Curated annotation (Swiss-Prot):
NDH-1 shuttles electrons from NADH, via FMN and iron-sulfur (Fe-S) centers, to quinones in the respiratory chain. The immediate electron acceptor for the enzyme in this species is believed to be menaquinone. Couples the redox reaction to proton translocation (for every two electrons transferred, four hydrogen ions are translocated across the cytoplasmic membrane), and thus conserves the redox energy in a proton gradient. The chain crosses the membrane at residues 8-28, 34-54, 95-115, 123-143, 188-208, 209-229, 251-271, 284-304, 322-342, 382-402, 412-432, 468-488, 505-525, 613-633. One of its GO terms (cellular component) is plasma membrane. Pfam families: Proton_antipo_M, Proton_antipo_N. This is NADH-quinone oxidoreductase subunit L. It comes from Mycobacterium tuberculosis (strain CDC 1551 / Oshkosh).
């Protein structure tokens, strides 16, 4: 371990936003006037520390760049010793810069977006708590500390999604997100228990060193349990249903959850645990299947959503599916998963903040059927949203082209039927993404004006537009900077490993042409449906079965209700009935017997001496009779 300033100051990454959250949440109304400024300062300070640590890492050789800081011994309990240890390596640094950088821009944007909210100070406190938890998650050097950050992110998301708690829909959405994430958290916790019982430690270094000697069955079980946790946190099938409802929170929350923090946590967990998954092919196959299914699942849902935020939420489910698919490919895909995660952070944050500007301009209206023709009224929002749109659909040379194209090529490179299925799913997802995002673009900024009478859309203030502009710049250039020359792949190689260049199932130019071809088809179909014909202000009732299913989130909630909720409720009622009739019934019967016996005995206590004398005489006769019987026997 190389001694450097990073070994002394890494803890500030977590401490600064955590201190900001503590001051804002416990300081009360005294911080109302300047609380938003403190929240932004804490986020920017964390980004500054991250930039300082990056400069420190760049000054050293690749294999010596990891920064370790043991703050204190946290849990010394027999065979279990857990240190409050922090680790910044090449993988962690990618997340630190994304979380703190994009998170800071979202903080600044929120100054304008939440300007009229009386609880703005509390909102910034929750944002700081979210940032601190996510940073702890990615800089922890062991699974226990990661789990603390994991739970902190879950708590902060619950608070932010339900921030407007006076709205029943927001309170319900917060509870739904919290409960569904508890399912994944339980899976991750059991996976950690199994990890400790197998390796005797929960530190990354100790676990990964022991992986080669472990049973493949145990590694598979651990991998599947960790995948369950990742599915909940990153909204992957079958635990994706909470993400659409999470749009009930303020729009900056959507940007923070979808772009820079929460939904990327599952991808981080899988890539960080790469040495384990590399030796558990069954678990790795499950990761690939989940990613492929989810990227199509989310894309189909996005095609039928009229609420602009819910359409973008569906796109997040799909785009995270691409990342999970890439992570499931092992060393061949880890770097591409992280590349898409980073580029997605820019263009998805830009899309959500742009949608927030549109909603702000349209007086909280979120139905795209009530938009139309907004490009003239919102020129900056239109330009920044448009650049992010080109990035997400994968038009060269925008960011998404490089990262998504790399995943498609890696999927096709898996070879055989597996490669054909995975590559086909990735290509189909790219075409559907182009369709629904073009639909969003056309319904919002083009066509006739479908505004309600009296609406006067206006551009957002500078404090909101400048973060959008910076994110648009990232949407344009980040992909090329990370991909050209294998920059990100070489940067991550000491952590995620490398693989020999496999024989491509298709030449690179063919894979790229196919990807651009399906994107062009998606754009053309969307233009034909939404660019050349009037769009009704009310969604048609008579639609195809697929559209109806997509509007209902492919019946994800109905599936959970029928498969889990109702059987669970019936089981609970049965257990309660057994408890009432059996356990409680036995206790109550015994109490009744004792009560009745005592009542009868009490009636025998008359208070008259002759009754007591008679009782004594009867007792003596019975004793004498018993003795006589014994003697005769």
């Amino acid at each position: 371990m190389t001694t450097s300033l990073g070994t002394h100051y890494t803890w500030l990454l977590v401490a600064l936003p955590l201190a900001g959250a503590a001051i804002l949440l416990f300081g009360g109304r005294r911080t109302d006037a300047w609380g938003h400024l403190l929240g932004c300062a804490a986020a920017l300070a964390a980004f500054g520390v991250g930039a300082m640590l990056l400069a420190d890492m760049l000054g050293r050789d690749g294999l010596e760049r990891a920064i370790h800081q043991q703050v204190f011994t946290w849990i010394p309990a027999g065979g279990l010793q857990v240190d409050f240890g922090l680790q910044i390596d090449q993988l962690s640094m990618c997340f630190v810069l994304l979380i703190s950088g994009v998170g800071s821009l979202i903080h600044i944007y929120s100054v304008g977006y939440m300007a009229e909210d009386p609880d703005r100070r509390r909102f910034f406190g929750y944002l700081n708590l979210f940032l601190a938890s996510m940073l702890l998650l990615v800089v922890a050097d062991n699974y226990v500390l990661l789990y603390v950050g994991w739970e902190g992110v879950g708590l902060a998301s619950y608070l932010l999604i339900g921030f407007w708690y006076h709205k029943p829909s927001a309170a319900t959405a917060a509870k739904k997100a919290f409960v569904m994430n508890r399912v994944g958290d339980a899976g991750l916790a059991v996976g950690m228990f199994l990890t400790f019982s197998t390796f005797g430690t929960l530190s990354y270094a100790g676990v990964f060193a022991g992986v080669p000697a472990a049973s493949r069955a145990v590694l598979t079980a651990i991998g599947l349990l960790m995948l369950l946790g990742a599915c909940a946190k990153s909204a992957q099938v079958p635990l994706q249903a909470w993400l659409g409802d999470a749009m009930e929170g303020p729009t900056p929350v959507s940007a923070l959850i979808h772009a820079a923090t929460m939904v990327t946590a599952g991808v981080y967990l899988i890539v960080r645990s790469g040495p384990l998954y590399n030796l558990a092919p069954t678990a790795q196959l499950a990761v690939v299947i989940v990613g492929a299914v989810t990227l199509l699942f989310g894309a189909i849902i996005g095609c039928a959503k009229d609420d602009i935020k819910r359409a973008l939420a569906a796109s997040t489910i799909s785009q995270i599916g691409y990342m999970v698919l890439a992570a499931g490919l092992g060393p061949a895909g880890y770097a591409f998963a992280i590349m898409h995660l980073l580029t997605h952070g820019f263009f998805k944050a830009g899309l959500f903040l742009g949608s927030g500007a549109v909603i702000h301009a349209m007086h909280e209206e979120q139905d795209m059927r009530r938009y139309g023709g907004l490009r003239a009224a919102l020129p900056v929002t239109f330009a920044t949203f448009g650049l992010a749109y080109l990035a997400i659909i994968g038009v060269p040379p925008f960011a998404g082209f490089f990262s998504k194209d790399a995943i498609i090529e890696a999927a096709l490179g898996a070879g055989g039927i597996r490669g054909s299925l995975l590559g086909g799913a990735a290509l189909l997802g790219a075409g559907v993404t182009a369709f629904y995002m073009t639909r969003v673009m056309l319904m919002t900024f083009f066509g006739e004006k479908r505004w309600t009478p009296g609406a006067h859309p206006h551009e957002a203030p500078a404090v909101m537009t400048w973060p959008m502009i910076l994110l648009a710049v990232g949407s344009v250039f980040s992909g090329g900077l990370l991909a050209v020359g294998g920059t990100l792949r070489h940067w991550l190689q000491p952590v995620v490993g490398s693989h020999e260049e496999a024989t491509h199932a298709l030449p690179t130019w063919v894979a790229t042409t196919l990807a651009l071809g399906v994107v062009a088809v998606g754009i053309a179909v969307a233009y034909r449906m939404y660019g050349t014909a009037p769009i009704p202000r009310v969604a048609p009732v008579r639609v195809s079965a697929l559209t109806a299913a997509a509007r209902a989130d492919l019946y994800g909630d109905a599936f959970n209700e029928e498969v889990f909720m109702r059987p669970g409720a019936q089981l609970t009622n049965a257990v309660v009935a057994v408890d009432d009739a059996g356990v409680d019934g036995s206790v109550n019967a015994l109490a009744t017997l004792v009560s009745q016996t005592s009542n009868r005995l009490r009636q025998m206590q008359t208070g008259f001496a002759r009754n007591y004398a008679l009782s004594m005489l009867v007792g003596a006769v019975l004793v004498a009779a018993a003795l006589l019987v014994v003697q005769l026997w």
